[in-house]
């Protein structure tokens, strides 16, 4: 399998885990869990959406998603949120946490940035970013 497609598949899989975990926790009959589940669903849909098309607002406010290190820390953070639940969602959170740690480590592997999918190459989007 091509490394670029592999990273895209991981990103889509993590986004799918976010959405699935959010829907599982959405019906937990707790206001706080339902609110957190809505945020997890939105972040999951955003992660999936970044693999399809990159809107200029994502480039401006979500620039951390365009590098292995930034996306790795985001996945690790979200994985710990999911890991705080119990049962199957905790297992899914552990998988996301592992993906986040792997992405953080991949940031320091020489030449691996060349295989990053289009959605993780921040230099491809520099012309769309406004100078502040």
Swiss-Prot record:
This protein's UniProt keywords: Golgi apparatus, Membrane, Transmembrane, Transmembrane helix
Membrane disposition: Multi-pass membrane protein
One Pfam family matching this protein: COPI_assoc
GO cellular component, one term: Golgi membrane
Side Lumenal, residues: 25, 78-89
Transmembrane segments: 4-24, 26-46, 57-77, 90-112
GO biological process terms held by the UniProt record: vesicle-mediated transport
Main location: Golgi
Cytoplasmic side: 1-3, 47-56, 113-132
Subcellular location: Golgi apparatus membrane
Superkingdom of the source species: Eukaryota
InterPro entries xrefs: Golgi_TVP15
Primary role: Golgi membrane protein involved in vesicular trafficking.
Family assignment from sequence similarity: Belongs to the TVP15 family.
Name of the molecule in the record: Golgi apparatus membrane protein tvp15
Organism: Schizosaccharomyces pombe (strain 972 / ATCC 24843) (Fission yeast)
Gene: tvp15
């Amino acid at each position: 399998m091509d490394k670029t497609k592999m990273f895209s598949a991981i990103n889509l899989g993590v986004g799918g885990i976010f959405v699935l975990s959010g829907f599982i926790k959405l019906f937990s009959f707790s206001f706080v869990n339902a609110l957190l589940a809505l945020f997890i669903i939105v972040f999951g849909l955003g992660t999936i959406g970044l693999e399809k098309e990159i809107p200029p607002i994502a480039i401006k406010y979500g620039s951390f998603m365009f590098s292995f290190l930034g996306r790795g820390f985001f996945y690790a953070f979200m994985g710990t949120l999911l890991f705080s639940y119990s049962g199957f969602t905790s297992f899914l959170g552990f998988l996301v946490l592992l993906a986040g740690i792997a992405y953080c480590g991949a940031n320091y592997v020489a030449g691996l940035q060349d295989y990053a999918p289009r959605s993780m190459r921040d230099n491809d989007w520099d012309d769309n970013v406004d100078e502040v």
